[in-house]
């Protein structure tokens, strides 16, 4: 075994490229590089010979394409190697795809390789990239301004559909490959396009590589080390970036939202890496066209003092900054749809944002306006009311203030994203006086209830049901889905140790504890029994009433049993204190409490859980079983609800 063979074997072992039970598909063009790789693998004994086959794609781009195909067929037939050949008119395909020749050739080539691998149950694709290719690639990406993920160049292996692409020849040079081919008397075709200065790579090969080798003959090993160290750095930052995105990313139908409150405080290198990781996710890993400029544009938008801005990214991806959120969505920018409605007394209109507005005479009983209602003195306005978009120059007379204020300034003060402002309903009377922008601001025409005056009441009702609006109602993701599951695994291990051999009765407190209990008990590896109890002191409100009611009692007796109570959150503690005392009164052998969340700031009675998942701040939290007005229980994470939702 000569030095070249030894280095390739060492590289294969170092990067775990080939195992004895692998099946290899060798991509062979008919040139010296791929033919040498095939010869090396065929004679290496790394895998049995019957585990090796060949794929050749005839692009019909070069005059000697037929000769290249013939070289592959001849060699494979002489050695008894199975081979698969496909012919594609790449020029025609490029026109139909509206892509460049090189990009199209790569697409059809890998489609062919992956198809063969799937049909023949092959798990490794061997490619003949070498050390010269590596230097050229790194330099080209740096000069072009590629994102930093590309600085490490060609990787020893990468994932494909159903397998991996491997590059065993990366540690050896083009010259060494030619020597190998000549030594073994391999007949190959020379690609005449490799000498054309029309192609960028060829210019690097002809002009830069000779200079670098002349400056330092060890340039190959230096670039190899640079590639490996850069790749290691990338993987380390990638893991941190992935964790950062898990905590700050919401997938909401066609829109993906990055929460900026915490994200923008992270170090710049981590922000850049996270943005690139996010773009790769959005583009389904095909983000080769993403450059440093794209990433810096997004970072600048995040760090800018301008709270409302947007940029267009490749392939019709739009990034919209809306104060503390950055939205990504594919498609053309939405042109604001104009609307204009007349609202007569006792009428109700439906808006495109799934909200409705109703105008009625006030009833004889006292009514409060709230955030979703407004009382008007009939003598001060002219019907019908008008519900429309904002228009340039709109001004509102403010309650408790002298003079009027531009709607634009009101929206800025309220932090309404620019792209949302044209969608908001503006309610005026028939003479044009602006009365109300629901959810934003009421005018000076807002009145208190009067028994003596004729008054109208406007009701604005927003549908907060449904998946899309549900996520939009969340101010911040407090605990991600991954963090929840990691903590549940930890609690499961602790409870397994605690209750092994004791056959506890596990009591779930309905309804909120159901998701937590379901996931937790999957992680408790011992015999147990389950029961449920519904005990409440909240009703449909947001503040504990202090009165505890049993809505559903236990089916099983707790007498003499070890009881484990599972709850979603301990807030005031009244409900849990009552329940624990009740179970003790019923002569349980022991009672312990496990809660997913503990909110000490809300405590009104002395009670502590034996097992706690997370301590949370004094915020209105929902999701993963926790609700507001029976909504949001099905969120997969714990989030902080926007105040305007539970204040309505």
Curated annotation (Swiss-Prot):
Cell location: Cytoplasm
Binding site for ATP: 29-34
Reactions catalysed according to its record: IMP + diphosphate = hypoxanthine + 5-phospho-alpha-D-ribose 1-diphosphate; GMP + diphosphate = guanine + 5-phospho-alpha-D-ribose 1-diphosphate; cytidine(34) in tRNA(Ile2) + L-lysine + ATP = lysidine(34) in tRNA(Ile2) + AMP + diphosphate + H(+)
GO BP of this protein: purine ribonucleoside salvage; tRNA modification
Documented EC number(s): 6.3.4.19, 2.4.2.8
Cofactor note (record): Binds 2 magnesium ions per subunit. One of the ions does not make direct protein contacts.
One example GO MF annotation: guanine phosphoribosyltransferase activity
Protein residues bound to Mg(2+): 627
Pfam family for this entry, one: ATP_bind_3
Domain of life: Bacteria
Cofactor or coenzyme needed: Mg(2+)
GO cellular component assignments: cytoplasm
Keywords carried by this UniProt record: ATP-binding, Cytoplasm, Glycosyltransferase, Ligase, Magnesium, Metal-binding, Nucleotide-binding, Transferase, tRNA processing
UniProt-listed InterPro entries: Hxn_phspho_trans (IPR005904), Lysidine-tRNA-synth_C (IPR012796), PRibTrfase_dom (IPR000836), PRTase-like (IPR029057), Rossmann-like_a/b/a_fold (IPR014729), TilS/TtcA_N (IPR011063), tRNA_Ile_lys_synt (IPR012094), tRNA_Ile_lys_synt_N (IPR012795)
Family: In the N-terminal section; belongs to the tRNA(Ile)-lysidine synthase family.
Task of the protein: Ligates lysine onto the cytidine present at position 34 of the AUA codon-specific tRNA(Ile) that contains the anticodon CAU, in an ATP-dependent manner. Cytidine is converted to lysidine, thus changing the amino acid specificity of the tRNA from methionine to isoleucine.
Free-text comment about domains: The N-terminal region contains the highly conserved SGGXDS motif, predicted to be a P-loop motif involved in ATP binding.
Listed name of the protein: Bifunctional protein TilS/HprT
Organism of provenance: Listeria monocytogenes serotype 4b (strain F2365)
């Amino acid at each position: 075994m000569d030095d070249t063979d030894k280095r390739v074997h060492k590289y294969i072992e170092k990067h775990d490229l080939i195992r004895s039970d692998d099946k290899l598909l060798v991509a062979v063009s008919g040139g010296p590089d791929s033919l040498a790789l095939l010869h090396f693998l065929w004679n290496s004994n790394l895998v049995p010979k019957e585990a090796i086959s060949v794929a050749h794609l005839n692009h019909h781009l070069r005059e000697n394409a037929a000769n290249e195909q013939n070289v592959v067929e001849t060699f494979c037939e002489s050695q008894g190697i199975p081979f698969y050949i496909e012919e594609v008119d790449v020029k025609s395909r490029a026109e139909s795809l509206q892509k460049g020749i090189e990009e199209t050739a790569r697409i059809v080539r890998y489609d062919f390789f992956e198809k063969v691998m799937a049909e023949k149950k092959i798990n490794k694709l061997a490619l003949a990239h070498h050390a010269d290719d590596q230097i050229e690639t790194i330099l080209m990406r740096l000069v072009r301004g590629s994102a930093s993920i590309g600085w490490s160049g060609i990787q020893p292996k990468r994932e494909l559909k159903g397998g991996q692409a491997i590059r065993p020849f990366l540690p050896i040079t083009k010259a060494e490959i030619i020597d190998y081919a000549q030594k073994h008397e391999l007949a190959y075709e020379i690609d005449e396009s490799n000498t054309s200065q029309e192609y960028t790579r060829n210019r690097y090969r002809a002009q830069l590589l000779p200079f670098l080798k002349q400056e330092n003959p060890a340039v190959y090993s230096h670039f190899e080390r640079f590639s490996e160290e850069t790749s290691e750095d990338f993987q380390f930052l990638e893991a941190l970036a992935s964790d950062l995105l898990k905590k700050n990313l919401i997938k909401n139908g066609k829109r993906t939202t990055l929460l900026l409150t915490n994200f923008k405080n992270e170090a710049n290198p981590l922000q850049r890496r996270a943005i690139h990781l996010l773009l790769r996710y959005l583009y389904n890993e095909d983000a080769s066209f993403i450059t440093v400029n794209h990433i810096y544009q997004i970072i600048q938008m995040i760090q800018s003092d301008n709270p409302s801005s947007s940029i267009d990214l490749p392939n019709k991806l739009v990034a919209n900054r809306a104060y503390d959120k950055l939205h990504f969505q594919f498609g053309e920018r939405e042109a604001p749809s104009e609307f204009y409605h007349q609202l007569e007394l006792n009428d109700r209109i439906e808006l495109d944002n799934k909200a409705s507005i109703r105008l009625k005479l006030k009833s004889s009983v006292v009514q409060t306006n709230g955030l979703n209602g407004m009382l008007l003195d009939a003598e001060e306005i002219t019907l019908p009311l008008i519900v429309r978009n904002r228009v340039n120059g709109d001004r509102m007379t403010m309650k408790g203030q002298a003079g009027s204020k531009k709607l634009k300034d009101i929206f800025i003060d309220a932090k309404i994203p620019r792209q949302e402002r044209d969608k908001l309903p503006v309610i005026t009377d028939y003479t044009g006086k602006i009365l109300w922008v629901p959810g934003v601001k009421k005018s000076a025409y807002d009145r208190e209830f009067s028994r003596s005056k004729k008054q109208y009441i406007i009701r604005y009702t927003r549908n907060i049901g449904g998946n899309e609006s549900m996520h939009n109602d969340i101010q911040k993701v407090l605990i991600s889905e991954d963090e929840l599951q990691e903590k549940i695994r930890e609690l499961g291990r602790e409870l397994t140790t605690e209750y092994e051999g004791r056959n506890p009765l596990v009591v779930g407190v309905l309804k909120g504890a159901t998701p937590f209990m379901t996931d937790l008990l999957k992680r408790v590896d011992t015999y147990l029994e389950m029961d449920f109890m519904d005990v409440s002191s909240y009703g449909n409100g947001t503040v504990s009433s202090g009165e505890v009611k049993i809505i559903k009692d236990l089916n099983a007796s707790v007498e003499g049993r070890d009881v484990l109570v599972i709850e979603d959150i301990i807030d005031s503690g009244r409900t849990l204190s009552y329940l624990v005392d009740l179970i003790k009164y019923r002569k349980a052998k022991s009672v312990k409490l496990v809660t997913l969340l503990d909110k000490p700031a809300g405590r009104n009675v002395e009670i502590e859980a034996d097992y706690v998942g997370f301590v949370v701040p004094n915020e209105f939290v929902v999701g993963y079983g926790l609700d507001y007005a029976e909504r949001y229980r099905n969120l997969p994470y714990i989030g902080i609800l926007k105040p305007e939702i539970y204040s309505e």
